[in-house]
Amino acid sequence: MELKKIFISIFFVGLVSSAKAEMIKPAENLSAYDVIKIQLDALKNNDDNDTGIKQTWLFAHPENKKMTGPYARFRIMLYDVHYRILLNHFSHKIDLVMNTENKFVYGVKVLSEEKKQFYYLWHVEKGNDQNCKSCWFTSGVSMPTDQGNSI
């Protein structure tokens, strides 16, 4: 299982790091873990064009998009004090907290650019959009909990 996570991490970092990388779209073959990894790697490598935010938006749950509004509002939300920590962060660690057939909750430890640690709960649920039926999407991300300075 750990080897699979390492392989997936290397694979997605390679995809996201490529300046001309095509956006990864929701697909039935992607797991809940794949979705959160795609999003976190994209946010870690966000650029001046906000490619990381755009990638993350693709995996926002369709029901949440109704609440957050269009991409422009989602982008503003990610630049808010609570979520900008995710933009160009130094590293992250993903741990499964709980799961059911249609929902996974992950604990995400993020080390910010300023080397401060934060903790988020990341909810991933099955959903449908016009291009993907029964795919995994992020349905919610908690406010961060400040875990203090890194050693």
Segments from the language model and where they lie:
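Short, aromatic-enriched amphipathic alpha-helices that serve as compact interaction elements
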Residues: 31-47, 59
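Sec/Tat signal peptide C-region and signal peptidase I cleavage site
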Residues: 17-21
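Short solvent-exposed beta->alpha transition segments
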Residues: 50-101
